[in-house]
Amino acid sequence: MTASSLRHLGLALAALTLPSLAHAQTYDAEQIDQVRKEARSHVGPFYATPRITLKELGVDSNVFNAAGQPESDFTATVTPSADVWVPVARRALLQTTVGTDLVWYNNFATERSIDPHVTGRGELYLQRITLFADGGYRNTRQRLNYEVDLRARHVEQAAEAGVAVKLTPKFSIETAGHYADLRFDGDTTLDGIRLQRTLNQETRGYSVTGRHRVTPLTTLAVRYEQLEDKFEFSPARDSKSFRVMPGIEFKPRALISGSAYVGYREFTPKNDGALPKFSGLVAELGLSYTLLGSTTFGVTYSRDLTYSYEVLQPFFINNGVGASIRRALGRRFDVIVSADRFEYAYENLAVDAPATGDPLTVAPVKGPIEQRVDKTWNYTASVGYRIGNGRVGFGVSYWERDSNQRVFRSYDNLRFGTTVTYGF
């Protein structure tokens, strides 16, 4: 299976087993006890869980997502990684995750890459107050999303810092500042467009989240976010927006686990004569239910605005929906099947620009323009066998994309191969 198909399988597994990490932080010293109990190794103040993952070993039947004359290749991706924690009594916890994707293609040397990534987080517990900060860095050649078919080197950075306060035993409020940065190499082009011209961006903002614990396993929440996007080479894309999203969170031990947030976003471009406005529904949902301890059903749904690399269609509304089933067969075997659909509904620029990606001159567009919609489907099946701290699996994944306007955007792809995860 390729990296993108494996990421999808990982999302299915996450929906089946874990709540949303971003919106279900516990912020208490019990995490320190959990780290000391579950870490695989302990040396001095350091607790660590190293692992090695064979993300894929198999065949990609359409390496470049080509509409015609697809080219196949044998591929492998190996990822050594480690989680490291440093507890400080019961007052603080430092955590970092480091790893590298080693991507290899047998025939297409241009698709090979080394993709390092690291994340870190620190929490300081002061009775009812928790101070936290985290950050992440990824330098990768893997595809940015399901729109950009080119494997292009880019750097993603993110940082967050904030405070969570327990006002009562059941009610807490959290506020945080956010920063994100995306940078593509300057010589990377797709369809004649330099990706750095349309995608290099910096996002700053803050969020305020209130949580009310209804039961030990269920929490109601409301999150408000204010965001500002600035583009290095395309200032006409600069914008401000806010999101208001009520939601509910369930801990893993609940009958239903995961989280669901549904709300409203208002997107306001700084140059409203060029970029279209958007206001409407946004959502982040990932829920799972386990039947009789052996069959787990998962559902995911996401809807939000995402920037496009296209000059004349600067962003799209991404509607993603998925369903998955995991069935345990005895103590060691399991079977996972999933189906996902991603719909990208593009918004047209209010002005015309040259196809070079350098929007230096503009002219008004005359007449109505049909909305472009691209749909990507993915069907995945995997059989796994657990060995100690690891899992060996064989998977098959079929991808299909159609577009109502761009025939050359359509493709299909059958991928199959082996995955191995082992924790030391």
Briefly describe each language-model feature range:
Residues 1-10:
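Bacterial N-terminal signal peptides that target proteins for export
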Residues 24-424:
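Gram-negative and organellar
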